[in-house]
């Protein structure tokens, strides 16, 4: 048992270093190509001329697509091995290391050039790769899946400052191949990864800063649960839109470089309307939570960002949809809150409350993981008093979503890739 805890600690440190490496690589690329040192792609887009804002995501997509296409052509005769941590957990716990690193580099290119895709996919993949590399050299084969799971949970904890949610991510989404008794090492890896991340960055323990002083009574809990119903319908619709968009890109029969370039070009076009479509949506989520905009502003940015996310994910841009889903959920919740604000007092507070609820419930509706989604929002914001209401709303959203559409976003992602 002590041996396992020691290995879990080592994997937590390795995962945090892998995530930190990806973050620093992003900052370097943003400085080299965008002259941006703020860490916000939205700020970078705002400071660019319109023509550069238009073509930068397309150039990044073209470069990433060429990298993936070239690697595929050079390795056509090699036997297939997993390049995704979910696939590795469902098989024999082994990765194609070269292909996985190329995929991560391609993700770095599209993310740093402004595509509306999450960087967490590559971060978690690199964390799982680091864990797998260590495990194959230092542990017996029958434990490899456990250590990959520890690496994935640690990567998520490091990326989102949410160790418990990272552990439950494994338990609720990926645990089909593991015993519940293995959750101990997973939690240790996640917590150690978060502590290492804090030591490396010295940043805020919370991912998002929220000022919410609204007292929770029957009315507020009713609004939270009703937001879960809204998200339970919107989640399957969002997944259907992603599938339909992806199939539309495939029907164009473009080579990967041009397919990803087209997705990036669409993001560039949308960024001419609002630079907020660039990136994974983190900075826009933070600004919305600090100062909720008017309903018309939220609606405009929401529509543009949704189209950008669909273009990026549909074109096959390597990355995650976790953070974009949080932004879309926030927007849905805030729109719902703003509409109720016409009749109820405390419009801004209600918008923030239902925005946070929208983040949790849309995540639950798309992942079918209500406990993970609830804990994630609480850990990212520190608003643990929302936990009871969020948990009920997330369960409602997850059950309704599963009734309308059996597949989660992760099963859908595995099937498409």
Curated annotation (Swiss-Prot):
Protein name (record): Voltage-gated ClC-type chloride channel ClcB
Molecular function (Gene Ontology), one example: voltage-gated chloride channel activity
Entry superkingdom: Bacteria
Localization in the cell: Cell inner membrane
Transmembrane segment boundaries: 5-25, 54-74, 146-166, 168-188, 190-210, 222-242, 258-278, 288-308, 316-336, 339-359, 380-400
HAMAP family given in the database record: CLC_ClcB
GO CC terms of this entry: chloride channel complex; plasma membrane
InterPro entries: Cl-channel_core, Cl-channel_volt-gated_ClcB, ClC, ClC-type_chloride_channel
GO biological process per UniProt: response to acidic pH
Family, as annotated: Belongs to the chloride channel (TC 2.A.49) family. ClcB subfamily.
Source organism per UniProt: Citrobacter koseri (strain ATCC BAA-895 / CDC 4225-83 / SGSC4696)
Keywords: Cell inner membrane, Cell membrane, Chloride, Chloride channel, Ion channel, Ion transport, Membrane, Transmembrane, Transmembrane helix, Transport, Voltage-gated channel
CDD domains: Voltage_gated_ClC
Membrane topology: Multi-pass membrane protein
Record-linked Gene3D superfamilies: Clc chloride channel
Record's function text: Probably acts as an electrical shunt for an outwardly-directed proton pump that is linked to amino acid decarboxylation, as part of the extreme acid resistance (XAR) response.
